[in-house]
Amino acid sequence: MQLLSRIVLAAVLLHLTPVFAQAPKKAVASPELQKEFDGFVGKFRAALKANDSAAVAGMTRLPFMADSSIRDAAQFRAKTYPAIFTAKHRACLQRGKAVYDRDGENNDNYFIFCGQTIFVFTKTPTGFLFTETGVND
């Protein structure tokens, strides 16, 4: 009887293994969220196409990346915009596909990958904003 119990237990555990081994489900944005982001990114891309640093600063969460030296639009335009939004990155952001995901704090984010740089756009209480860049590793 003890042997039969062990065999049944082993069979049950083997049967459950694929359930735990499955890849996590990929996050999918709701149609409403996607529509909101599409509207935002259209305006963001138009500002980049015009090389309008003031408009981009207005669509950016400040202080940028929690850096107190980039706490307002003037500082963003002077320090960050020229360094991050090179002609190459502006062109990439025009054509780059945005990828949706949720972060560990359950925030809705879209990412656009441009070479070694990731551009992050986050849903905030006031709508979507450009929130940070990161290294594409």
Question: Where are the predicted features?
Answer:
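Bacterial N-terminal signal peptides that target proteins for export
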Residues: M1-V8
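Hydrophobic helical h-region of N-terminal Sec-dependent signal peptides
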Residues: L9-L14
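C-terminal-biased regions
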Residues: P24-K49, S53, A57-D137
